[in-house]
Each structure stands twice: as structure tokens, then as C-alpha cells.
UniProtKB/Swiss-Prot annotation:
<keyword id="KW-1003">Cell membrane</keyword>
<dbReference type="InterPro" id="IPR036890">
    <property type="entry name" value="HATPase_C_sf"/>
</dbReference>
<dbReference type="GO" id="GO:0005524">
    <property type="term" value="F:ATP binding"/>
</dbReference>
<feature type="topological domain" description="Cytoplasmic">
    <location>
        <begin position="1"/>
        <end position="25"/>
    </location>
</feature>
<protein>
    <recommendedName>
        <fullName>Sensor histidine kinase YdfH</fullName>
        <ecNumber>2.7.13.3</ecNumber>
    </recommendedName>
</protein>
<feature type="transmembrane region" description="Helical">
    <location>
        <begin position="79"/>
        <end position="99"/>
    </location>
</feature>
<feature type="transmembrane region" description="Helical">
    <location>
        <begin position="126"/>
        <end position="146"/>
    </location>
</feature>
<keyword id="KW-0418">Kinase</keyword>
<feature type="topological domain" description="Cytoplasmic">
    <location>
        <begin position="68"/>
        <end position="78"/>
    </location>
</feature>
<keyword id="KW-0597">Phosphoprotein</keyword>
<dbReference type="InterPro" id="IPR050482">
    <property type="entry name" value="Sensor_HK_TwoCompSys"/>
</dbReference>
<keyword id="KW-0472">Membrane</keyword>
<feature type="domain" description="Histidine kinase">
    <location>
        <begin position="201"/>
        <end position="402"/>
    </location>
</feature>
<dbReference type="Pfam" id="PF02518">
    <property type="entry name" value="HATPase_c"/>
</dbReference>
<keyword id="KW-0902">Two-component regulatory system</keyword>
<keyword id="KW-0812">Transmembrane</keyword>
<dbReference type="GO" id="GO:0005886">
    <property type="term" value="C:plasma membrane"/>
</dbReference>
């Protein structure tokens, strides 16, 4: 994912050198203007310039400043061309000066060397040598033998100060760019975490509502169908019994729904012994559907609340699917742990079975999807086997985060 440029989106977003040049545009332009004004004042004070030379000097300085202003555009492919042109312009400007006033132009050479520090990488040494060569030629042309030592004594400190300032400036710009990019990456990561948190919370809400309200309503619907059949046959006593069971089931569903809503508001509390909850769930299904439910519980470790809660809802969803879709007569539930600290959960029925691949792709059936999401939420592994007319078997393996119980 692209990170927005701290200065301008349209510029080279990830090019540190281009950003350095962007940061240098205004202070660099001010420095060039200072060189221009100082050169004009000194030459006119000495009385050694004509109007024609003034025009030529002004035009060259303007071109130099214009190229500097757009230096960020030269970074990627035309770095050598940029410094070659700027070096020649500086060379020409120095030749327009007279006598010792070439010291003013030293500032432009030092300025270009400072730009090389922030703009060029592998070709830095070559470009610096190129500019120093031009400076030596300028100095040799303008200075007499007796002036060379004075020139070096004055010019060297000036260049060192300007180059040091440029290096410090670019180092500060680099740190600022890194800080801004880091801040933007952190903000982006924070937004992504918020989005993922919201998405996960929505998925959890969908699972909880499905595992409470949807399962309860499915069970109630089956009981109402049974009541209708018994009333049609005149078996009012049995219909009354099922109505009583339905009322209990409605109360239980309401309680589960409230528990799910409370869970959205606060952290999950301990849900009790898993075996007792599964047994209670099986009793409800036996009463409402007439199915036979067999439990093989050989768990020796205490499950954390999250794992126990998800296992409970997975079993409930499997039983609902077996009653609603598979038309099963018997359900076998097995729970055990192994020596490697893993929980094994198997739910098997003798229903009509189904095509597993088509079942995974079928839209609108949140049961299988909900099981997969719950298994993923507890870092488990999920496997489903189904054969037509022979039933379905769901196998789940989950790492246990608990301690061994005392025998």
C-alpha cells in the first residue's frame, strides 16, 4: 500500500532525494538571491561592469535559479545532466566576475556540492570532482600567483561552512521525512486495526445471533410442526406436552440471546462446565426433535472460556443442521484430549448427507460458515466428511490452553 508523500502527493512519493530537493527549494532560492545581490553590489562599487554584462549575469543567475527550483524532477534519470549544466552556468558566472570578487561565486560551487550530498548517491564523488575542477580553472584564470594563498585561506572555510550546513540540513530533512512516513504508516495501521476489529466484531455478532436466536427458532419451528401434526390427528395431550416444551425452549432461547448481548457489552464470563451444558443441550433436542443423542466425554483438561464457549456453539450448530437438513435419527458427539494438549471434537450423524463442496459455496447458509469461523477463532483445524445416505461427520482439533485436572 502506498504511503502519502508528506509534502505533495504528485511528487516522487518514495524518493528521499527528490524530497530533499523539495525541502531545499525555498532556502536555496534565498541563497541564490543573496549571491546575486552581493555580486551586483560589489561589481558596481568597483565600477567594473557594463549593462551588457549585468544582463548576461542576471539571465544566467535566473536560469540557475529556475533549474534549482525544478531540481527534484532531475533526480531519477538526469542527475549528471543537472550538475553538468549547473556547473557550466556557475563557470560562466565566475568568468563574468573580475578579480577577487570570484569569492562570491564560490558560494554557488559550495551550494552545488551541498546539493550533491542530498541529491546524488553512487556518482557523488565524480560530480564533486567535476565541480572542483571547474572551480580550479576559474581560480587559475582570474587570480595572480600572489593571490592564490589568500584565496585558499578565505575560500576553504567558506566552502566548508556551506557544505557542512547543507549536510546538516539534509540530515534533518531525512529525519523529518522518516518521522512523517512512520507517523502515516502508524495511522494507516491504526485504521486497518480498527477496520479489522469492527469486521471481526460483526462476524462474532452474526455467529452469536445465529447460534442463539436462529437455533432456538429452528427448534421452535420443528416443535410447532409436530404440534400441528398431533392436533390434526386429534392427539391433544401430546400437543400440550410439546407446547410446554416449546415454552421452555423459548425461555431458554431468550436467556441465550440476552447472554450473547451481554457478552457484546463486556468480556465473557465463565460459562460453566462444558459437559453439563452439552448434556442440557442434548436434552432439549431430544425433547423437541425425538432424535437420539449419544455423548462420549473424555476430556481431562480445563478449557479456557473462549474455547469452551465456541465448542458449545459448534456442537449446537451441528445438532441443528442434523435435525433440520440431514433428517438424522441419531447424533454421536465425542470430546477427548490427547497427550499433546489438543482437544478433539467429533460430531457424527446418520442423516442423508450432502455434497461438501457445494455446501461450502451455497449462499444463505451461515451454519457451516459459522462453524468454520468459530474454529478459526480458537486456532483450530476443521474437517468435514459427508456421504449421501450415510451421514456426515465433522472433526475439529483445537490446541488447549488450560491445566490438567487432578485425577
Amino acid at each position: 500500500m502506498l504511503i502519502r508523500n508528506p509534502f505533495k502527493d504528485k511528487y516522487y512519493s518514495h524518493d528521499r532525494r527528490a524530497l530533499n530537493m523539495l525541502a531545499l527549494r525555498v532556502p536555496g532560492l534565498a541563497f541564490i538571491l543573496m549571491i546575486y545581490i552581493a555580486s551586483i553590489v560589489l561589481q558596481f562599487v568597483s565600477g567594473g561592469w557594463s549593462i551588457l554584462l549585468l544582463y548576461a549575469f542576471t539571465i544566467l543567475i535566473a536560469i540557475f535559479a529556475l533549474l534549482h527550483w525544478h531540481s527534484y524532477r532531475w533526480v531519477k534519470k538526469r542527475v549528471i545532466l543537472y550538475f553538468a549544466v549547473q556547473g557550466l552556468i556557475t563557470f560562466a558566472l565566475a568568468n563574468l566576475m573580475t578579480g577577487f570578487f570570484i569569492l562570491v561565486i564560490i558560494g554557488l560551487y559550495a551550494f552545488l556540492i551541498g546539493q550533491i550530498i542530498g541529491m546524488a548517491d553512487r556518482r557523488r564523488t565524480f560530480l564533486i570532482l567535476y565541480l572542483l575542477l571547474l572551480l580550479v580553472i576559474n581560480s587559475a584564470y582570474h587570480l595572480h600567483k600572489g593571490e592564490v594563498l589568500h584565496f585558499i585561506v578565505i575560500a576553504a572555510p567558506i566552502m566548508i561552512v556551506i557544505i557542512t550546513y547543507a549536510a546538516t540540513f539534509f540530515a534533518q530533512v531525512d529525519e523529518k521525512i522518516k518521522a512523517q512516513l512512520t507517523l502515516e504508516r502508524l495511522e494507516l495501521a491504526h485504521q486497518q486495526v480498527e477496520q479489522l476489529t469492527l469486521q471481526n466484531e460483526r462476524q462474532r455478532m452474526a455467529r452469536d445471533l445465529h447460534d442463539t436466536l436462529a437455533q432456538g427458532l429452528v427448534s421452535l419451528n420443528m416443535q410447532l410442526d409436530a404440534i400441528h401434526v398431533h392436533l390434526a390427528k386429534g392427539n391433544t395431550e401430546r400437543a400440550k406436552e410439546i407446547i410446554q416444551q416449546s415454552m421452555k425452549r423459548v425461555k431458554s432461547t431468550i436467556a441465550d440471546a440476552r447472554s450473547a448481548i451481554d457478552d457484546l457489552r463486556s468480556k465473557s464470563e465463565e460459562i460453566g462446565v462444558l459437559k453439563e451444558r452439552i448434556t442440557s443441550l442434548m436434552d432439549h433436542f431430544i425433547e423437541s426433535t425425538g432424535m437420539a443423542c449419544l455423548l462420549d466425554y473424555r476430556l481431562h483438561q480445563v478449557l479456557d472460556v473462549r474455547t469452551a464457549e465456541n465448542c458449545y456453539y459448534i456442537i449446537g450448530e451441528c445438532m441443528t443442521n442434523a435435525a433440520k437438513h440431514a433428517e438424522a435419527k441419531t447424533i454421536w458427539i465425542s470430546i477427548w484430549d490427547d497427550e499433546k494438549g489438543r482437544l478433539h471434537l467429533t460430531v457424527k450423524d446418520n442423516g442423508k448427507g450432502f455434497d461438501v463442496e457445494k455446501g461450502k459455496k451455497k449462499r444463505g447458509h451461515y451454519g457451516l460458515l459459522g462453524i468454520q469461523e468459530r474454529v478459526r477463532a480458537i486456532n483450530g483445524q476443521f474437517n468435514i466428511k459427508s456421504t449421501k445416505l450415510k451421514g456426515t461427520q465433522i472433526e475439529i482439533t483445537v490446541p488447549i490452553q488450560g491445566e490438567m485436572q487432578d485425577e
